[in-house]
């Protein structure tokens, strides 16, 4: 935000120079980005009056003038400006004057005519880029007065970065409040005398969306002269704030916007049919905006309409049809409080960012509307004439923001600041900030001012007290603390160790947003309710993630769109699952997830191109699980997941509890997300794995191991993992290894069945096993498989 230093000093004028003022504003939390003079360096320019203006005898585009600058004679000056005319008060650079760029004014002859000075434009004085003509001063500008003094050009433009929580400082009044508080000075506000109604003209106003528009004020002003010139003082204040003068009506609403921080709008009353209706847009409704573009409105967009059509996007941009033009005589002034949530994101959807939407998205003082309406009415009538009707106020108190009541404890204040501030100082600071304060024993009850949306909790008051007291006034004190060594159990498995393993396997770690697109998330987790944000960055980031897959799959698409088809990425982070049993109704689980797609290996002349499959990812996952020492306790079970391919996925169970999923992304989901080719994902609940099984030292057998192979025929739906698990359980004392080395379907095996070839490794730590013992153990395994799975030995 830009503003004039002199305009600020009209409200509060501390006895400090510009640099100190800028530093003070920065230390108050409103970072000053720049301080620049409002005009170039020049001297010798005064107010003059063109007494005579005649055509130059030797040049069609030049005029010969006689100018009164308050001296004992008139000056002959040749001027080429198209707006030069008799009776005009102008800025005159006299002989000896020096203009910006070290341009010195001397007596000269132009096409044979003497010229004893120069009539200046704004650009020639370094005030603005306007070089369309010479400066036109008011008719009462005192002749001979230094133009720097008359236009108050010994001024600076201060530009500040206003953080989103300090919307109250998007007007001169807000910055002035802070400066007044910091310097313990009174705030000198302009006198705003209510304008009484002199006519009875009104328009009916209906608010159909009170949640989006808790307060709407409208006032008819009739008989205005829209062509009346905007006063130079107002033009200059607008210019120094970076706003170009348009016409008197628009300039007045912009002036109130900059002064009080309250957006306003003026409608051409004669173009409104019936009355004003504040409602949500109809799906597909269109509106031609003031810039001539057509906006297609969504049902969640607030509009100001008449009885037949939309007139404006509420709090964002006016419509062309109802806008003020050169023929306008009667206007309806609008001043409203729109809920920030009803405005947020709507302007960006249409490629807009207006001064009004910028303020409404952050929050406007809900108690400001009557004051702004009276200020705008007075300025409009003073400049354009006309008569005002009564103010129509439609307010829904139930939906207006409520002022927060906050308890500030002395113990909390001292602990967070680390310094004791006297009670009377704390009370004084809070009251100067605009709070209604009630003192108690070692605490304060403060009711936040209506313009401070960011004062909600105790820490906010602590911050305000410290800010106003001055961070530099808080003494440096060494921290007194004792160091306690953190305990580290042998069973603790660092997530960093797992990340290193995945890095070694070619994965890259990514970090994605916890805020995701609710529509995409519903594709991945259909029917699962997510936590929605009340004030999202955008609609596409309005839900908290239910898993890490949403962000990871979006990252894959992003990379594939940039010709990176072989992707291996992983992420660790929290998911947010609604749970009525959890604190605040949300369960936060630390998850580890990964995605792979593309070729199994990097391109190589000696390797065939093979696409990754389920077993590639399962193998990587087993390596991770092996680090935990719990691989032998993990089961991969066939279980449906709407995001995964039903025939190429599995749920992961640890001791009967599901801890994750692994599998190929469902083909339908691949299509919807525009994934290129087969994509595989996994996700694990990390906290259920972080407590690893500590390796136990055991004796290594000095006796030979024996291998026996068996082939068993089982039904197609029997998982091979269950077969291996049963063999391990039966041969627990002698079977030290079980491995599946072949799966066969075809000739010799009935349809609906499969043959599993299994190797059994048998060994004892105390002796060499006899053949009879080996045969007995193998037979025991076969019998167990036959009994549980109706397996039979294959011939």
UniProtKB/Swiss-Prot annotation:
GO terms for biological process: phenylalanyl-tRNA aminoacylation. Its cofactor is Mg(2+). GO terms for cellular component: cytosol; membrane; phenylalanine-tRNA ligase complex. Signal peptide: none annotated. Residues 401-476 form the B5 domain. It catalyses: tRNA(Phe) + L-phenylalanine + ATP = L-phenylalanyl-tRNA(Phe) + AMP + diphosphate + H(+). GO terms for molecular function: ATP binding; identical protein binding; magnesium ion binding; phenylalanine-tRNA ligase activity; tRNA binding. Residues 701-794 form the FDX-ACB domain. InterPro entries: aa-tRNA-synth_II/BPL/LPL (IPR045864), B3/B4_tRNA-bd (IPR005146), DNA-bd_dom_put_sf (IPR009061), Fdx_antiC-bd (IPR005121), Fdx_antiC-bd_sf (IPR036690), NA-bd_OB-fold (IPR012340), Phe-tRNA-ligase_IIc_bsu (IPR045060), Phe-tRNA-ligase_IIc_bsu_bact (IPR004532). Pfam families: B3_4, B5, FDX-ACB, tRNA_bind, tRNA_synthFbeta. Tetramer of two alpha and two beta subunits. Belongs to the phenylalanyl-tRNA synthetase beta subunit family. Type 1 subfamily. HAMAP family: Phe_tRNA_synth_beta1 (MF_00283). This is Phenylalanine--tRNA ligase beta subunit. It comes from Escherichia coli (strain K12). The lineage of its organism: Bacteria, Pseudomonadati, Pseudomonadota, Gammaproteobacteria, Enterobacterales.
